[in-house]
UniProtKB/Swiss-Prot annotation:
Phylloquinone binds at W671. This is Photosystem I P700 chlorophyll a apoprotein A2. InterPro entries: PSI_PsaA/B, PSI_PsaA/B_CS, PSI_PsaA/B_sf, PSI_PsaB. The gene is psaB. It is a multi-pass membrane protein. Keywords: 4Fe-4S, Chlorophyll, Chloroplast, Chromophore, Electron transport, Iron, Iron-sulfur, Magnesium, Membrane, Metal-binding, Oxidoreductase, Photosynthesis, Photosystem I, Plastid, Thylakoid, Transmembrane, Transmembrane helix, Transport. Chlorophyll a B3 binds at M662, Y670. The lineage of its organism: Eukaryota, Viridiplantae, Streptophyta, Zygnematophyceae, Zygnematophycidae. PsaA and PsaB bind P700, the primary electron donor of photosystem I (PSI), as well as the electron acceptors A0, A1 and FX. PSI is a plastocyanin-ferredoxin oxidoreductase, converting photonic excitation into a charge separation, which transfers an electron from the donor P700 chlorophyll pair to the spectroscopically characterized acceptors A0, A1, FX, FA and FB in turn. Oxidized P700 is reduced on the lumenal side of the thylakoid membrane by plastocyanin. It is found in: Plastid, Chloroplast thylakoid membrane. Chlorophyll a B1 binds at H654. It comes from Zygnema circumcarinatum.
Length: 734
């Protein structure tokens, strides 16, 4: 008999219903639950899959480079980055009539194309690429790297090349290699690329495979390095009149600390970026020699953790027992990694616009908006994932004996206090913020706007002033002419920084007022509520007063049967599921805020945000409704335009989003009846009844239907906002 899907679970493979297919897909990556899995095979499978992931990433980035080189306008864009629209790739669509062909033929192309809003043009230009040949070379190189990654993944599944479990659990060696090798050496290599290729290219000197070994990046070569006169590398920086990519106004410095932005490109100075990466490299290469491995020198992580016992004994055993708990739990490690990655991704969103690293990115408003929104959504999904795997850790891997009275055990002991404090913070933020918004709404509706309650964010303004923003008139730290901090930095980074922070033409420390105060607290409400749901889900994953034996039921269960009331919807999976809605809701507010504030700044109309953002009707009318007009006009009586595709995506996104509710609100019985009715009709219809299922059709389980509903809700929500964001921004700024 041929083996049926899924091969990894004989129990499921023998299921006579369509449940076999859905549960098979749902558990395909839950290696721990598969038949005949051993700890060794588990680690090896995950290790090999990492190479597969890398292969996919390199293939994808190779495709980006290839399509821009083949169908884009990279060389034309490089000659005039502010006026030529960058092309991502051509569009071939047999449905296009003449109006569509004309609408989508842009950027100097001969046929319909997509415009790139990803920032790759700015990135490739900044790092020294200038020709299509450069792009093709990069695409080919990444294709080769992708192939190597695939072979490596296959190789590490072969008997001779399978690493042992002890190798995977050698935490000190892994940390040393990742710190020194992954972060340290790659940062050093990137510094090398910036100094040897990107900086000379930014000064109009072409560096290629033919001359990079013979062209020193600094007139004095390595002499200052070996003679200890490192400051020579910072002398003669590019002038403020430097034209990027040309010799005009170019200097010779390679490692600087200028602060602020290049006046023409509005991006960070390349020589500052190189200096930053060099510092990071030194730091991480040193850090990668910290932990004790073969030579008996350096720190032992186990000893460090075991020594972390709070004094006076009032706070338990501190970090004792954590080494084995973390080292033996893949879910704990994944939770930590996801939490870190989530924070970093959100930081990328924040820094991409406030300190733009790529030349001319600051002038490409749609790309800035797209990059901010993209990174914030990714961060949200990654962070919720951290808590999901934290909850799975508590269910599958946590050992109370190993963790007696340490920090993990005490978290569980104090969970009521933790959860109730979070709940109190969420309630306080929610009622007060909504109360202020609604009060202001009513005052506007009654024609007495002067009766609004408007609170200046004085603490935030004070912090901005401390960093040198002089607008608010606080006489503090870098806003105080007599401050020692001010005089100490005058010779290096401060003048550039102070120019930038007090310039009205960038997004560094935006001017804030009562509208910002309110939306900040709305976002704080969203963050605290999301965290409340996630933390409660993880801390109650093993059991609660209502259901002390919860961990016996696993991560996701719908209920414990009809005979035990109150056990529905309380699995750790359900907490994750609910938290994702709150996460999406919160990031909605974050991106609305960012986008509207920037639209008004870019249009030179900051007063609109300041005046309309203090009441809900202002957000609905002056942000959402006003900026959706381009989308609504994508199709009109006069034909179509280049925003039509976004208008269609806006509608399609709403459709997908609404479909989610069909799964979220109607449950198994409804679907089971519907399916049985359809099957009955099918079996009694001539011709149709010649086709039979092997599996008996059954409705999705409650948990699965929720997942399908959540997936549609999330995808529809993001599609809708992406279309709105790109159309409303590109419609205004071209």
């Amino acid at each position: 008999m041929a083996s049926r899907f899924p091969k990894f679970s004989q129990g499921l493979a023998q299921d006579p219903t369509t449940r076999r297919i859905w549960f098979g897909i749902a558990t395909a990556h839950d290696f721990e639950s598969h038949d005949d899995i051993t700890e060794e095979r588990l680690y090896q499978k995950i290790f090999a899959s990492h190479f597969g992931q890398l292969a996919v990433i390199f293939l994808w980035t190779s495709g980006n480079l290839f399509h821009v080189a083949w169908q884009g306008n990279f060389e034309a864009w490089g000659k005039d980055p502010l006026h030529v629209r960058p092309i991502a790739h051509a569009i071939w669509d047999p449905h296009f009539g003449q109006p569509a062909v004309e609408a989508f033929t842009r950027g100097g192309a001969s046929g319909p194309v997509n415009i790139a809003y990803s920032g790759v043009y700015q990135w490739w230009y900044t790092i020294g690429m200038r020709t299509n040949q450069d792009l093709y070379t990069g695409a080919l190189f990444l294709l080769a790297v992708s192939a190597v990654a695939l072979v490596a993944g296959w190789l590490h599944l072969q008997p001779k090349w399978k690493p042992s479990v002890s190798w995977f659990k050698n935490a000190e060696s892994r940390l040393n290699h990742h710190l020194s090798g992954l972060f340290g050496v790659s940062s050093l290599a990137w510094t090398g690329h910036l100094v040897h290729v990107a900086i000379p290219e930014s000064r109009g000197q072409h560096i290629g495979w033919d001359n990079f070994l013979t062209t020193p990046p600094h007139p004095q070569g390595l002499t200052p390095f070996f003679s200890g006169q490192w400051s020579v590398y910072a002398q003669d920086a590019d002038s403020s009149g430097h034209l990027f990519g040309t010799t005009e106004g170019a200097g010779t410095a390679i490692l600087t600390f200028l602060g602020g932005f290049h006046p023409q490109t509005q991006s960070l100075w390349l020589t500052d970026i190189a200096h930053h990466h060099l510092a990071i490299a030194v730091l991480f290469i040193v850090a990668g020699h910290m932990y004790r491995t073969n030579f008996g020198i350096g720190h032992s992580i186990r000893e460090i953790l075991d020594a972390h016992v709070p004094p006076a004994g009032r706070l338990g055993r501190g970090h004792q027992g954590l080494y084995d708990t973390i080292n033996n739990s893949l879910h704990f490690q994944l939770g930590l990694a996801l939490a870190s990655l989530g924070v970093i991704t959100s930081l990328v969103a924040q820094h991409m616009y406030s300190l733009p690293p790529y030349a001319f990115l600051a002038q490409d408003f749609t790309t800035q908006a797209a990059l901010y929104t993209h990174h914030q959504y990714i961060a949200g999904f990654i962070m919720t994932g951290a808590f999901a795997h934290g909850a799975i850790f508590f269910i599958r891997d946590y050992n109370p004996e190993q963790n007696k009275s340490n920090v993990l055990a005490r978290m569980l002991e104090h969970k009521e206090a933790i959860i109730s404090h979070l709940s109190w913070a969420s309630l306080f933020l929610g009622f007060h913020t909504l109360g202020l918004y609604v009060h202001n709404d009513v005052m506007l509706a009654f024609g007495t706007p002067e009766k609004q309650i408007l609170i200046e964010p004085v603490f935030a303004q004070w912090i901005q002033s401390a960093h040198g923003k002089s607008l608010y008139g606080f006489d503090v730290l870098l806003s105080n002419a007599a401050s020692p901090a001010l005089s100490a930095g005058q010779s290096i980074w401060l003048p550039g920084w102070l120019d930038a922070i007090n310039s009205g033409s960038n997004s560094l420390f935006l001017t804030i007022g009562p509208g910002d105060f309110l939306v900040h607290h709305a976002i704080a409400l969203g963050l605290h509520t999301t965290t409340l749901i996630l933390v409660k889900g993880a801390l109650d994953a093993r059991g609660s007063k209502l259901m002390p034996d919860k961990k016996e039921f696993g991560f996701s269960f719908p209920c414990d049967g009809p005979g035990r009331g109150g056990t529905c919807d309380i699995s750790a999976w359900d907490a994750f599921y609910l938290a994702v809605f709150w996460m999406l809701n919160t990031i909605g507010w974050v991106t609305f805020y960012w986008h509207w504030k920037h639209l008004t700044l870019w249009q030179g109309n900051a007063a609109q945000f300041a005046e309309s953002s203090t009441y809900l009707m202002g957000w609905l009318r002056d942000y959402l409704w006003l900026n959706s007009s381009q989308l609504i006009n994508g199709y009109n009586p006069f034909g179509m335009n280049s925003l039509s595709v976004w208008a269609w995506m806006f509608l399609f996104g709403h459709l997908v989003w609404a479909t989610g509710f069909m799964f979220l609100i109607s449950w198994r019985g409804y679907w089971q009846e519907l399916i049985e009715t359809l099957a009955w009709a099918h079996e009694r219809t001539p011709l149709a009844n010649l086709v039979r299922w092997k599996d008996k059709p059954v409705a999705l389980s409650i948990v699965q239907a929720r997942l399908v509903g959540l997936a549609h809700f999330s995808v529809g929500y993001i599609f809708t906002y992406a279309a709105f964001l790109i159309a409303s921004t590109s419609g205004k700024f071209g």
